[in-house]
Amino acid sequence: MIILTNSSSLTLGPGQSATFDTVRLHTGCAECFRQGSGTVMLTARNAIYDISAGGNIGATAVGNANLTVFLNGSPMTEASMNSATAAVGDTNSVSRETGVRTCCCGNVSEAVTLRNNGETTIVLENPVLKIRRVA
């Protein structure tokens, strides 16, 4: 299991991934992470993982903000978090959870990122990414 967060707010333009500078907990070796990056590699083959993500998001302009968990560069639509911002500076708490089964073939790792999948720049406060191998 790994739990990541960041010690300061992040401003993410459309398409940018959150980076994490704080590892709250890391047990075992089923996930790899380089501090300061935004990617967690799921290294166990034919495994099942629970992925939880969230934080407080606000748009730098009035409109809809979107934060999404990506797997290997593709959005996981079931792990998409939307927030309607009525005024600049408003923040909303968002969170999602999903599951992933990794490939059983070859020496393949799955890459998990948390990305601004919207059309407006967002401010992300207290982000958290928790990944736990369950089988």
Language-model features and meaning:
Residues 1-44, 48-135:
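Extracellular jelly-roll beta-sandwich "head" domains, especially the C-terminal globular C1q domain
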